[in-house]
Amino acid sequence: MPLRNVAEYLERSAARVPDKTAFSDAAGAVSYRQMLHDAQALGTVLAGLPGCRNAPVAVMIGRTAASVTAMQGVLQSGCYYVPIDEQMPEARMRSILGQVHARAIVHTAANEPQARALTDCAPLVSLEEASQHTPDEALLRARREEILDIDPVYVLFTSGSTGTPKGIVIPHRAILDFTAWMTEFCGYTEDEVFGNQAPFYFDLSGKDVYQTLSLGASTA
């Protein structure tokens, strides 16, 4: 059956290669099984928030495996994510959050201080705390079934060099089609170990994340 939601990449790979490393960083590695569990636990928490239905959720981003888990957790809830560089000035963070009207801000223990400065913008959700919840798979499935392939996966903001940063919406279909084309054109397989070359708030990172998840490959 053709895919229409990129969240299915992680689910299918976790079912096929559960114990394989999905993403790794200086702090360690996360398997497909663990990433799916933590993403679904986060998705369950987000799905319980008011107005969190096919809505924007900000993710405080570093170049870590946990950041990928957080992004996938947002998708599991049926929402879409807005990457926020943890090192950008607070004024820029507030500008982005104000434009998208984020329903929540997901953060990790590593960037909690930056997130706490934004508590007046949206509720904070800790990835580590959310991962302790039991995933409600039926709820998440129902939420994702509402999503069309023209709905957003994420919104990236431009540098703002010409004024106010502007949001660029990336839909599910764009990622599904591009990932399928890249796999065919380059002959990628699940044996690949990709190198993450771009920060997750930059468009090129989508290739690193979704090529990996779609194949059941690994990224370091």
Which residue ranges define each predicted feature?
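Catalytic "switch" loops of ABC-type ATPases
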Residues: 197
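Conserved AMP-binding/adenylation subdomain of ANL enzymes
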Residues: 166-193, 203-220
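Carrier-protein-dependent adenylate-forming modules in NRPS/ANL systems
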Residues: 1-174, 186-187
